């Protein structure tokens, strides 16, 4: 996929950016390559900023561990109060809509986190869903069932082992279709939350000196429509994932 606005990178070394290996269509592994919306956005943003980048897909928990160990940055991550103390955030690169999925037989069209009171909710291990949802989990509004990814969560939902799954709309829809659950699982009509996503680096990283360049690239590619075009093209191509 080529974009005329991109300029050749000139740095001799590559910055490492980790992404989740199991969150299609946003970020996932295909063979040895990181693919999906975020890897495509990251490569475009860094190339436009003339910064070489190596995008690596790993389990999300390991991505965060590598970030905490200052082994590289992470993309496709939400901002919360705890993370702001440790990481430097770029400008937003995308906005995700968190949807609630339930079995058709028990669907009550939840619209608020309090609608999950007393339920067992499927979440992804190591994820933050934003301060509001994270706080509700800590307060025991719902009981969290952790899985390695959306696929496992939707399998658990189909089997009746969880009551609800929290998932990004585009990603959840991919798994409902791929697992053949379209006649068994439905999603809420409105998102429970909208979360911007970012590129982040550890505050001890020497790479944070390039964040200004990265932010300028993000702003320019957003203004000329490149980021939106990339997202749409990758999403369209992932419809058959």
Per-range role (PLM):
Residues 7-14:
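Sec/Tat signal peptide C-region and signal peptidase I cleavage site
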Residues 14-85, 146, 224, 233-234:
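Extracytoplasmic small-molecule ligand-binding "clamshell" domains
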Residues 17, 24, 32-44, 104-139, ...:
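Bilobed "Venus flytrap"/periplasmic-binding protein-like clamshell domains
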Residues 20-22, 96-98, 179-216, 237-241:
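Periplasmic-binding protein-like
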């Amino acid at each position: 996929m080529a974009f005329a606005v991109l300029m050749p990178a000139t740095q001799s070394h590559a910055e490492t950016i980790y992404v989740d290996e199991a969150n299609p269509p946003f970020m996932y592994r295909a063979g040895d390559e990181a693919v999906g919306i975020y890897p495509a956005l990251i490569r475009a943003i860094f190339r436009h900023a003339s910064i070489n980048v190596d995008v690596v897909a790993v389990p999300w928990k390991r991505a965060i561990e590598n970030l905490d160990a200052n082994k590289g940055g992470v993309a496709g991550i939400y901002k919360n109060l705890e993370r702001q103390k440790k990481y430097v955030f770029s400008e937003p690169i995308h906005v995700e809509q968190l949807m609630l999925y339930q079995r058709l037989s028990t669907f009550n069209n939840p619209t608020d986190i309090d609608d999950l009171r007393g339920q067992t909710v499927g979440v992804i291990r190591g994820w933050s869903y934003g301060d509001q949802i994270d706080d509700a989990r800590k307060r025991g509004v719902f009981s969290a069932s952790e899985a390695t990814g959306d696929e496992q969560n939707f399998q658990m939902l189909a089997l009746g082992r969880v009551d609800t799954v929290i998932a990004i709309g585009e990603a959840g829809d991919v798994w409902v279709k791929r697992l053949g659950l379209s006649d068994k699982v439905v999603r809420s009509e409105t998102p429970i939350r909208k979360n911007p996503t970012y590129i982040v680096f550890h505050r001890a990283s020497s790479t944070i000196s390039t964040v200004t360049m990265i932010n300028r690239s993000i702003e320019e590619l957003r203004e000329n429509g490149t980021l939106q075009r990339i997202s749409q093209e990758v999403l369209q191509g992932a419809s058959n994932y």
